[in-house]
A protein has these predicted regions:
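Catalytic core of membrane glycerolipid acyltransferases/transacylases, capturing the structured
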Residues: 18-35, 47, 61-119
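A short beta-turn/loop motif at secondary-structure boundaries
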Residues: 58-62, 193-194
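Non-catalytic C-terminal accessory region of glycerolipid acyltransferases
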Residues: 124-244
Length: 244
């Protein structure tokens, strides 16, 4: 974990510059900041000696916006998705993140924060997500609503509605994203106990929202949940077989 901190401090001036420039209509600032953040994560994983293995069942089209929906069991999830998700994107995160020194400032500038206990904050964040998608920038969201699963890899059921409502409204595809084993590498509640294991990520085929209405949101939500659940179950079954 020390590698993440030291490399972040080294690259923070570049991230900060990109964050400042990202307020303009020119995408240069966003590209600069995202490039620095990806470099940070990529180098940190190299220093940790931990490879990331991505199963590209689908390769996102450059310049196209998607809503990426991933399971969320570990604080490692943000670092991993920050490296593997291509293009320009915005995370949806809790407002508490901005209290973190330096990282919180960067996160608030580049991403979208929401106070889930506040209807006003949820409405504002949803509107900001709509504008982000309309500008051709993807959204990365953890539709469980945080790290709330008590028994990973069993996810919280059901997913929250926001991701699916915004995808339908903007007619943007949903891409289910399975973070297969982060909960074993960095278990929630044990932030400084990293277990070495190659990181496994699966980009599933996109689910089209073309022609869908809000009446289809529940079906879309269920379909996304089952795709991720199936992949997690395959991993669990494989581990059980391997240990016999």
């Amino acid at each position: 974990m020390l590698a993440f901190v030291l490399l972040f401090l080294l690259l923070f001036p570049v991230i900060l510059l990109g964050s400042w420039l990202s307020d303009s209509k020119n995408k240069f600032g966003l590209q600069l900041a995202h490039g620095a953040v990806r470099t940070w994560g990529f180098l940190a994983f190299i220093f940790m000696g931990m490879p990331i293995r991505v199963d590209w069942q689908f390769r996102p089209e450059p310049g196209k916006a998607y809503v990426y929906c991933a399971n969320h069991f570990s604080y490692f999830d943000i670092a991993v998705t920050g490296v593997v998700v291509p293009g320009l994107y915005a995370f949806i995160g809790k407002t508490g993140v901005k209290k973190l020194p330096l990282f919180g400032y960067m996160y608030a500038k580049l991403h979208i924060l929401v106070d889930r206990s506040s209807p006003q904050s949820r409405a504002y964040s949803l509107g900001k997500c709509m504008r982000t998608l309309a500008q051709g920038r993807s959204i990365v969201i953890f539709p469980e609503g945080g790290i709330k699963a008590h028994n990973p890899p069993e996810m919280v059921y059901p997913f929250k509605d926001g991701a699916f409502s915004m995808a339908i409204q903007q007619q943007v595809p949903i891409v289910p994203l399975t973070l297969v084993n982060n909960y074993r590498i960095l278990p929630d509640g044990k932030p400084f106990r990293v277990h070495w294991e190659p990181v496994q990520v699966v980009f599933h085929e996109p689910i089209s929202t073309a022609g869908l209405t809000q009446a289809d949101a529940n079906t879309l939500r269920e379909q996304t949940y089952r795709i991720i659940e199936s992949e997690l179950n395959k991993y669990t079954a494989h581990r059980s077989t391997s240990s016999v």
